[in-house]
Amino acid sequence: KNIFIPLGMHHTTYNPLANGFKKFAATSHGNPYEMRMVRDTLLGYVYKEINPDQWNGWRMYTLRGEVNDGNAWYALHGVSGHAGLFSTVDDLQKLVDMLLHEGKVGSKQFISEKTIKLFLTKDDFKNGLGWMMDPDNSFMKNAPAESFGHSGFSGTSIAVVPSLDFSVILLINRQNMGLLPTGYYYNPNPIRRQIFDAV
């Protein structure tokens, strides 16, 4: 109510099924990657306190309108800072436009310029607050220095180039194809880079 509604982001929400939304893409079929995470010592997340084969809480159906991330789904009821936000390209562009215009929406200062500057100031790892800002280490390869972006586990991404006043928002889904024989999902970075470079 403090961000999405005032920005006119009427198709952006957590838990869309509970909020009357019906149109959204499916993510994965169940939790195959997370099932692997708690079993496979190579991934480093083996949970020894329970036997994942005896736990019957795995989602074994195609996920539609549910956050894909297991921590957000099981522990945080679909609402978290790292996962679970459902949106559209049009709505996300409204958020990007506000960032590009130093916190302004039209003539109204929505978020202070100081806060926007804080969001988009590189730390020691060349990241802002919630934003990747190292163009040599992301799908925004060779972008101008002030560029910023964000990617999601399911394949989504936003790339913004303030000096050129443009953004690329991709709401793709790498999980619909299931896991590769290696046990991982497809890497969306090559197609992200190709689209970003083309734009």
What is the role of each PLM region?
Residues 147, 154-167:
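Short, surface-exposed beta-strand/loop micro-motifs that present aromatic residues
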Residues 101-105, 114-115, 178-199:
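Short, gly/Ser/Thr-rich active-site loops of penicillin-recognizing serine hydrolases
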Residues 135, 140-145, 151, 179-185:
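Peripheral terminal and inter-domain segments
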Residues 1-146:
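Short, surface-exposed loop or secondary-structure junction motifs
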